[in-house]
Amino acid sequence: MKKDLERIITENQVDALWISGAAQHNPSMTYFTGTIHVTNADLFVIPGKQPILFHGMMEREEAAKTGYDLISYSRYPLTELLKETSGDQLAANAMRYKKMLEDIGLTKGTVMLYGNREFGPFYSLIRELEDLLPGIHFKGDYDDTIILEARATKDKAELEEIRKMGQITTSVVKRVQ
């Protein structure tokens, strides 16, 4: 149950969850955002705070459907960072994420990674971020312990969403037969 998430995060000695990637075909992101349509987003779940969703400027209306605190990537222009890094894409993106994390007060502790991103570039970004923010330790949840435990029970709103999706699925199957 999402309302138990803060307790589950704390019990697992984690300071934040970082869910990254598109909202579609990304079970961890969909669990938190619902069926919104964003092509790329970064969601940070920090105990004691409203979740924070970073999103593309053109996707702000979809992002707003989550009810989370929203920050557009446009607040962190890559063109300026690329100038500072002499065109180094990795360094510029790492600086961008460093500023994003600093702005949400996430500069130390353990951050559990979830989501669906291209592995190589994301791994390189995480390594670079660990150098820029030595107080943060990023780690993967190999068994999906935290999110699976949260998903194990449902509150009324989550049950209603499941029922709604079941009705949609049933209606589509009837039309196809």
PLM region spans:
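N-terminal accessory/capping or targeting/presequence segment of soluble
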Residues: M1-K99, Q167
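Flexible, acidic/His-enriched mid-domain "rim/lid" segments that flank
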Residues: A91-Q177
